[in-house]
Amino acid sequence: MELSCSEVPLYGQKTVYAKFGKNVYLPEDAEFYFVYGGSHQRHVVIADRVQDNVLQSSIPGHWLQETVTVSVCLCSEGYSPVTMGSGSVTYVDNMACRLARLLVTQADRLTACSHQTLLTPFALTVEALPALDEELVLALTQLELPLGWTVLGNSSLEVSLHRESLLHLAVRWALPKLFHFLLCLPGGVKALKLPNEEATTPLDLALQGGHSTLVEDITNFQGSHSPGFSRLRLNEEATLQFVHSSETLTLTVNHTAEHLLEADIKLFRKYFWDRAFLVKALEQEAKTEKATMPSGAAETEEEVRNLESGRSPSEEEEDAKSIKSQVDGPSEHEDQDRLPLDRSFDGLKKSKHVPASLAAGQLSDVLNGGDEVYANCMVIDQVGDLDINYINLEGLSTHTSPESGRSMLGPQACMHTLPPDTSPCGRPLIENSEGTLDAAASQSFVTPSSSRTSNLNLSFGLHGFEKEQSHLKKRSSSLDALVADSEGEGGSEPPICYAVGSQSSPRTGLPSGDELDSFETNTEPDCNISRTESLSLSSTLHSKESLLSGIRSRSYSCSSPKISSGKSRLVRDFTVCSTSEEQRSYSFQEPPGEKRIQEEEWDEYVIPAKSESEKYKVSRTFSFLMNRMTSPRNKSKMKNKDTKEKEKMNRHQFVPGTFSGVLQCSGCDKTLLGKESLQCANCKANTHKGCKDAVPPCTKKFQEKYNKNKPQSILGSSSVRDVPAPGLSLHPSSSMPIGLPAGRKEFAAQVHPLSRSVPGTTLESFRRAVTSLESEGDSWRSRSHSDELFQSMGSSPSTESFMMEDVVDSSLWIDLSSDAQEFEAESWSLVVDPSFCSRQEKDVIKRQDVIFELMQTEVHHIQTLLIMSEVFRKGMKEELQLDHSTVDKIFPCLDELLETHRHFFFSMKERRQESCAGSDRNFVINQIGDILVQQFSEENASKMKRIYGEFCSHHKEAMSLFKELQQNKKFQNFIKIRNSNLLARRRGIPECILLVTQRITKYPVLVERILQYTKERTEEHRDLCKALGLIKDMIAAVDLKVSEYEKNQKWLEILNKIENKTYTKLKNGHVFRKQALLSQERALLHDGLVYWKTATGRFKDILALLLTDVLLFLQEKDQKYIFAAVDQKPSVISLQKLIAREVANEERGMFLISASSAGPEMYEIHTNSKEERNNWMRRIQQAVESCPEEEGGRTSESDEERRKAEARVAKIQQCQEILSNQDQQICTYLEEKLHIYAELGELSGFEDVHLEPHLLIKPDPGEPPQAASLLAAALREAESLQVAVKASKMGDVSQSSEESPGGTVLMDTPSTQDVPASPTASLVTEGTEGRGCWDVDPGLQGVVTDLAVSDAGEKVEYRSFSGSSQSEIIQAIQNLTRLLYSLQAALTIQDSHIEIHKLVLQQRESLAPSHSFRGGPLQDQEKSRYLEKQREELANIHKLQHQFQQEQRRWHRTCDQQQREQEAQESWLQARERECQSQEELLLRHRSELDHQLQEYQQSLERLREGQRMVERERQKMRVQQGLLGHCKHSRQRSLPAVFSPGSKEVTELNRAESLCHENSFFINEAFGHMSLNTSNKPNPSGVPWDAHPLEGSHFDLARTSESPTELKIDISQPPDVNSELWTTGPGHQRPALQENSKESYKNVADLDSFQSESSSPQDSNQRGPQPQTLTTEAKLSLPMAAGHGGDAGDGAEENILYL
């Protein structure tokens, strides 16, 4: 079962869905309940079936944060609730719950700012609160408000004139639902008008906040509203709550441990189905709460006064309007308040079957002053359409017109009726001491809310009765007399029944005449057909003629279930209740005989006339009705009807059936075969095709009829359902409480008969009389309870004795159902999450599936045991009253079986819970073997052997007893009903017994499958292997016990069949009789049919019985056994001197030779086959060997010889014990050595090498161990070791030369004391074992070295192999060591056994002469043959030892050779290692040299790179010089001398440009030649230097010099006139000068390189230094200066001319 939600808030009210598996079908006609079980509370809620396997319900509120168990219970008629599944839901405390608790506690401490301060702890804002509106209301609904609490706070506090209330807070938060809910709480109306400290009411706050919805609701509010829920406290522990919003009715019970689940569900059903009673109880609860409310919580002072006077404010008005309120109906707002609750309760009835006679309209009419009340079913003939007056208890009359009567036929008519304790004028009826009913003068107090709620009384039943109209037609309660009254009238309208309160209401509005005729009401449903429920029936019949206005009425106590063909009459129930709802007593009075009116006279008294609407009333008594019902005409009718009903009931709907398992035919009780079998589609009865006519009636149809006819008690009788009635006796003059719980099986058995003067002996007889109208017409005769119980089973409705509550232990079944629900999946992989399953390995999944199957089948087995125990055995003991010993023969050891398997399952369940990984759903059980070992070993194993041995032994006996009991009709009916039980799951007793006997055979299969997917060499694998062996031993022991029991039973059967007078004569003349076989020591060992060959060659059929001391031959005669008499030979042969030999050339014959002291005798016996002959010979030989000694055998022995023999035996036993102890000690030492080797291996770092520190054999004193298998295993391990060593050798040869060297270690050479017979083996074995310590730490290495030196005196260096091969070698050595040690232990034990056998043989040989007289030559020959066989076996043992020693020596030689090869290889490897080391050192030196060379190379490379850079710079310089030379050649023709004035700004600007561009740059612009002389002397007006103009154009060239250029300073400080004179000279003057100096210029160009390393001379610097205007240039050419006028260069006044 899966639940749709796992967490809910504390207030609940969430819809939950429960989905079951596909194989689970939920019946449509059953009721389902959700049971929420917590630590202190239990909630019961009804559930709806929405699909075939889905249920829907509502989660109730809970008061504690915890995880509760959710159980789904199924209820069907006649059965106890059955748990279908279980789950869990966690209740959590959310924000709405915390805020609701805060509002309740802070109600009297609110201020104007509380709407903000209260939200601070929750980090909420006012804008987020509307989402919590509905949740807050639900949380407040769930809370239990403190005593005296109101909306204004504690009622004990004085209410101030101005204070903040919860209504103000709800308006400020804008929560309309919370506001309406608070209005319904105590003090809500007063808080609505109460202003706060700011003098504002909630209405003012709503207007200010703009909450139009709240403003409208407050404005239209005219009174209190329903709070949305109703709560009823039944007692201190039980509470009912109905929530209108979710339409949920919840029963909450405290102290769940003290309540049975079944009782709680019954209590819930009582109130759920009896709604009028529920509403009345809710009204009383409301009145109680109102009456106990303190005055401080009252709304006004007037209400307080009314409260003290015991009347509500509306009662005075209702007193004046009583008639009008009944006819006109309730007010508008009352209708609005009632309708939701009506619809809510009607909603609860959806898809539910309402009982057909749930309730009947109840009226109280007091005739002649109201002194007498008629409680029978009144049939009032109303003819005419005139208005009818009805007199109520107060004398008020209700006038009902036809129109108003018709208007009340609908659902609104249900709201016009109030129960008597809520009506202002109603008076409850109290029983006086004389048994009559008087009207009490007390009045009931009604509050406005309770009066509105009470009006729902009638409406609850209407919805159900409208659904069951067709069903009611079939069950109308009219007698044959009513048919006579109705003849000739029109057809009747469909009957409509009203459900009213349990007490009659005098204010009930009634329809008019025609409508009254269409009504038919039955107040006694229990008298109709079914007897399962009892009703408080009151009837006080008086025949008075002074009736009010002579109204003619008829009164009946019961009615025939016939459909009235005429016009039905209105049947009114005048049942009145006493003030005590727990007990109701009425009296049956028999009027005088002369006032009885026969049926034929009824018509003359019943004359329909409109004017006679108020005339005479005639009452009938029970005696008349009894006579009427048993009339001959009715009897004949009932017989014909019974015949048809029985034929109809017997009809099955057979279809071809398919069955799983062994089933029996319901008709002949034989095994069913699939092809010839039929199955009823209704009751699932199985039968052969030829036996279908003999099958009992269809139980399903009977069950449906039973459910249909089973009545529900009317509203007035609900409160007395569960009142126990231990003893019931009816007396004609006394009143009797007859309320009984429905379905109680004790009822019929505890009814005592009445006196003979009463026609109906008991109330049960009366009810049976009513039921007999369908089943049997003569059921008035007295019958014993047991006869009626079993004879009517299956054919009569009186099956309530078996339709009773189940006897299954509820808590036990609930626990088991939850376990079964947990293991209902098909496999483990379907239980866990798919993601979790996908992460597991394939073998793990398969292993978990098998473990899950083991646990699942264990749960099913426990269920089968529970079915046998609680369904069948308990019912057979308690219901059938069978003898306990008889029942225990059918179910032997059942309690012990159940206890054992439950303990086993709980152990596995605990392991499953411990293995959970992250969540309860995901689990992986890693260990299950230890639980299996614990279950099938020691005490548990012996217990299971005993229990299963006894159970399986008595299987046949139980089945035969069961078949014998099935001959009883009572037992057959019981078994059929129990088989149809839901808990039985269609399993009968034979199936259950067979399943139990087969259970132990399932364990080996499951354990083998678990073992298949378990890793070997693990503790789990060993445990599983051990558990498997234990299980097989247990099964073998059970089989042996079953075989022994069967043989014992067979021996007893044979003894019973042996003729008492038979006898036979022995060889010694003694007579052997049957009585001699009755010895307790004799047991049957083997039996079978053989053939005794006579002297004439004929064969006689003989029954041969092999007992513990004799062999019997019996033959059958007249179905009895007698001693066989063949050839005058005795048919009793003693086993003391019996020898069995084969017959030559006859494979099926054998000779039995008896060498008795009286004389030998030989028998020739033949069997059916050779195998049977060999089996007989083997069993005879075993019996002879184990045969006890003959009584007279020891008489001839002397006491001294006996004492000597005993002393020898004692000495042999002592020697055997000593040898066993020594063997045990040797085995212990060997295991200790293995343990030490394992520890050394772990310390040496071989984690992957595993060694079990246990020997492979156990010292068993019973049988010596077999050494051949150990020897073969040792040889195989030696071969694997040889292969591993060779593989490692080849790997080492091909190993790389760069492998790092390893160290050396010394081998451990242990002492040679371990194997005395073969010291070399011990030396080699332990020497190889010592190699496991090859890389130990220095400290341990020293210890090993010392040990080796001290033991062997030599050192052996060892070189390690590669990692993988070395681990394989070490592992092989470890395994070989273990095998050799085990072999050594086996040989030691075998030697001990050999010595013991030698002593035994010597003892026998010494005793042989003294016992020679007992045997003869044949027995001596047999002994010699046995000794010869022993010698052969001993020789075989010595031969095996010799072979083992040879193999051991050969293996030692092989080991020595391998060791020498390994030592040689080790020395070669060491030499190779030294060579590698020298080569490594040489390589290191070469590497250092190469590093040095590399460093020098890098330095040279750096220098080379620097030289390359220098060459590149020189190459660049050359390119520049070449470019400059070409440029000079190109510009020489066009260059002109430029004369600069010394003080000109152009020169200054040119200087500045020089300094900006480069220190050693000189720019020559040929544009100077074109410049005007006028502009050369003018300053630069714009202030822009010359170099700012386009100097980078094509007319400018840059000449770069070397690092040490020659400075040439030109003095241009000539006057302006000179400059202008020079510039004014035309080109013709300058051109010749250039041509003359061109050669010198080219000559200077050729000398360009001479200026790279020269610097300017000091003379030039001195001459050119102090000039005011200078031009600095850098040039590689030495340009001569020509004076324009031939002046000196040193003169500053000379004009400097530069030629380019």
From Swiss-Prot:
Sequence ranges of Polar residues compositional bias: 1309-1325, 1664-1675
Sequence segments annotated as region (RNA-binding): 1493-1524
Residues annotated as domain PH: 1095-1184
Superkingdom of origin organism: Eukaryota
Region Mediates cytoplasmic retention and interaction with MAPK8IP1, residue ranges: 1563-1576
Disulfide bridge map: none
Zinc finger (Phorbol-ester/DAG-type): 651-698
Posttranslational mods: Phosphorylated on tyrosine upon stimulation of cells by laminin.
Main location group: cytoplasm
Free-text tissue specificity from the UniProt record: Highly enriched in the brain (at protein level). Also detected in lung and kidney.
UniProt subunit comment: Homooligomer; forms some cytoplasmic aggregates. Forms a complex with MAPK8 and MAPK8IP1. Interacts with RHOA. Interacts with microtubules. Interacts with YWHAE and YWHAH. Interacts with PTK2/FAK1. Interacts with NEFL. Interacts with CTNND2; prevents interaction with RHOA.
Stored PANTHER family: AGAP007712-PA, RHO GUANINE NUCLEOTIDE EXCHANGE FACTOR 28
Protein's UniProt name: Rho guanine nucleotide exchange factor 28
Organism: Mus musculus
